[in-house]
Amino acid sequence: MFKANVLLMGGDMTSKVMVPIVREPEIGYTATFLGKQVKISEEGLPDLRKQIRQHCYLPYVCSKAEVEKLSRDQEYVEKVFEDLEVEMVKDWLSLIPKKAPGVKVIIHPGNDDKFVLDDVLKNSPDIVFAEESVVHFDDLHEAACVGWSNPTPWNSPRECTEEQLLEKLEKTVSQLKSVETSCFCFHVPPYNSTIDMAPKLDATLRPVYEGGRPAFIPVGSKSVRKVIEKYQPLLGLHGHIHESPGLVKIGKTQCINPGSEYSEGILRAYIIELEDGKAKRLQRLEG
């Protein structure tokens, strides 16, 4: 449709929600999905799994005993999540030759993506794994890719101090041939940039309301902003804060965050056309 030469995915590939589908000897299967109790037969299982995945949730077919173990064994929960995430990413990667033939697919993880996924991505012949490295869009335009974030309330796998993040950013940017014609593909957006606004949380991680409305605060990275202001790349390509889509200029650099509504089955992205060291087109896409 768009005749793209490159497809870039900048992290947060996997779901944070698992949906147990419980085997019931006399019923078939039961599950709680989208707030509703669902009962299905064996024949309906593939369709339910498909529906769950379309919302980017992780379907987990299991017994009642396994559900009970999930409720009391956090290590088991983590192991199941890892296995399901690996399975989902492998399934997605298998679609690339059919869905995007001839397209250069570049993927780097985000702060929420577990390290176990790195080997899955590195072993795929159909993508370029780009974490903490530089990749080429074409002969002129490069991308410096870093998926780590500054600290979050969620203790995610790839977060670090601002000082550590700055070191990672500088090390990666130093590999670029020409910053002026390059993109900074940093998962976390720059601090206080309007594309980093997230709900303010209290000590129990519940949203704070002010004047009867949820309060929002900037949660992006000061190190990312510092590096963008220092080097002024062509584009800043960001994500991380799903509820804060937009486009903003920091100096000469246009920074974008497409946002995300994956749980609603909505794709958000940007169509970017690069030519002669300039961004000729930045078109938001959702559907």
Where are these regions (language model features)?
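Core catalytic region of metal-dependent phosphoesterases/phosphodiesterases
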Residues: M1-D138
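Divalent metal-coordination and catalytic microenvironments
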Residues: L7, D12, G110, A143, ...
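Active-site environment of divalent metal-dependent phosphoester hydrolases
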Residues: T14-M18, V103, I107-D118, V135, ...
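Active-site-proximal segments of metal-dependent phosphoesterases and phosphodiesterases across multiple
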Residues: L70-V86, C183-Q232
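Proline-centered loop/turn at the N-terminus of a beta-strand
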Residues: K104-I106, V128, E142, T181-C183, ...
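Binuclear metal-dependent phosphoesterase catalytic core
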Residues: V134-L140, S156, C160-T161, V227-K230, ...
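Binuclear metal-dependent hydrolase catalytic cores centered on His/Asp/Glu-rich metal-binding motifs
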Residues: D139-C183, D202, P214-K222
